[in-house]
Regions:
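An N-terminal-biased, well-structured beta-alpha scaffold segment characteristic
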Residues: 2-103
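Phosphate-binding beta-alpha-beta segment of Rossmann-like dinucleotide-binding domains, i.e.
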Residues: 98, 106-149
């Protein structure tokens, strides 16, 4: 990235908040400037204006998409770091062709995903959606499958 004391870091849309307020942002200060936008860009034009001149883009989840059309307009871009396990918000083929590294966080939230899956399994086994709809309709019938039998 050439001069590592003058890197332009951009967070183009931290919505919902994931990066803003993190004490770890201070660790970037010795290396360059950080621009963080707390809302999502409304269109590609605004997205590109926010990312103009960026060498590093820190993307929160999949809120902001990086298609070939966008990546080709960012000649200085060298890295897209996503705060997610997936990379589906980035055109990986275009990034590779343009020599842009893409990093994600695989496995970082695995315990939470596993916990959520177990919760969903219980919800299906106990017909939680159906039971909720019945209660909201004012019907309080006999509960079936209450003990997972």
């Amino acid at each position: 990235m050439g001069n590592t004391k003058n890197i332009k870091f951009v967070v183009p849309g931290d919505d919902p908040p994931q990066i803003q307020g993190s004490p770890h942002l201070e660790r970037l200060v010795p290396y360059g400037n950080l621009t963080l936008f707390s809302d999502r860009p409304v269109n590609l034009e605004e997205q590109m204006a926010r990312a103009e001149g960026a060498q590093v883009i820190m993307n929160t989840r999949g809120a902001v998409k990086w298609y070939r059309e966008a990546l080709e307009q960012l000649p200085e871009l060298k890295l897209i770091a996503t705060c997610s396990i997936g990379t589906d918000m980035v055109d990986l083929e275009a990034a590779k062709e343009l020599d842009i590294m893409v990093c994600n966080q695989p496995g970082k939230i695995a315990p939470y995903v596993a916990e959520h899956i177990i919760g969903l399994m219980f919800a299906v086994a106990k017909h939680a959606s159906y039971q909720t709809a019945e209660l909201k309709s004012g019907r309080w019938g006999l509960l079936k499958n209450i003990y997972l039998k």
